[in-house]
């Protein structure tokens, strides 16, 4: 303390003497300089050193925590990126599987259609029908004409006193009619099916 007081008093003494020599100036300049130096005992010095070391350790700890937080953030970003990539890969895999299943369904559908068409036989429909028609020339005589497509034959019946007519009978009387048998008809239908496939 005494050292600090001596310095301040000596500076103040110098300034007024300089001012006194300069009589031509009307202004007075006063400068105050304070110099403080604190002297510590060895115990206080070691205590301050330990406080300073603790402060530096605390600053280093905060810096370490900040770097760990930055590393953790980078790790989280990396994990999120990997999770996003895994999710995207999973979605792409699911989409590929759906596309594959759809292609399989289309192929199976086409195969089913092809096998159905190739394994089915087209058979002619055999129907039996009969028709009758008569025309009366005399009240007492009637005739019936029966036609059956089962055996692809046609018949005509005529009577002595009158005539019974039908389209099938007229065709049979006019001349020979080409008759398709079941085997020719089936072969024709199979050839038509082969052309369509």
Curated annotation (Swiss-Prot):
Residues making up the propeptide: 170-197
Cellular compartments annotated: Cell membrane
Organism domain of life: Eukaryota
Stated induction or repression of this protein's expression: Induced in biofilms and in oralpharyngeal candidasis. Repressed by alpha pheromone.
GO terms under cellular component: plasma membrane; side of membrane
Assigned keywords, A-Z: Cell membrane, Glycoprotein, GPI-anchor, Lipoprotein, Membrane, Signal, Virulence
Position of the signal peptide: 1-20
Main location (coarse class): membrane
Lipidation (GPI-anchor amidated glycine): 169
Glycosylation sites: 110, 114, 152
Membrane topology designation: Lipid-anchor; GPI-anchor
Task performed by this protein: Predicted GPI-anchored protein which may have a role during host infection.
Protein name: Predicted GPI-anchored protein 34
Organism from which the protein derives: Candida albicans (strain SC5314 / ATCC MYA-2876)
Gene name tied to this protein: PGA34
């Amino acid at each position: 303390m005494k050292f600090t007081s001596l310095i301040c008093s000596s500076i103040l003494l110098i300034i007024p003497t300089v001012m006194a020599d300069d009589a031509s100036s009307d202004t007075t300049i006063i400068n105050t300089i304070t110099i403080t130096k604190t002297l510590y005992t060895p115990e206080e010095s070691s205590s301050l050193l330990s406080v300073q070391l603790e402060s530096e350790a605390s600053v280093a700890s905060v810096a370490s925590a900040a770097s760990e937080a930055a590393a953790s953030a980078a790790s989280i970003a990396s994990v999120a990126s990997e999770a996003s990539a895994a999710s995207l890969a999973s979605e792409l895999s699911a989409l590929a599987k759906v596309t594959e299943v759809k292609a399989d369904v289309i192929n199976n559908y086409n195969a089913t259609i092809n096998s159905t068409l190739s394994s089915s036989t087209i058979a002619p429909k055999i129907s039996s029908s009969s028709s009758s028609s008569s025309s009366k020339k005399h009240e007492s005589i009637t005739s019936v004409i029966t036609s059956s497509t089962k055996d692809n034959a046609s018949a005509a019946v005529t009577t002595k006193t009158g005539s019974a007519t039908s389209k099938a009978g007229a065709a049979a009387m006019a001349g020979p009619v080409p008759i398709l048998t079941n085997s020719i008809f089936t072969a024709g239908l199979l050839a038509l099916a082969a052309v369509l496939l």
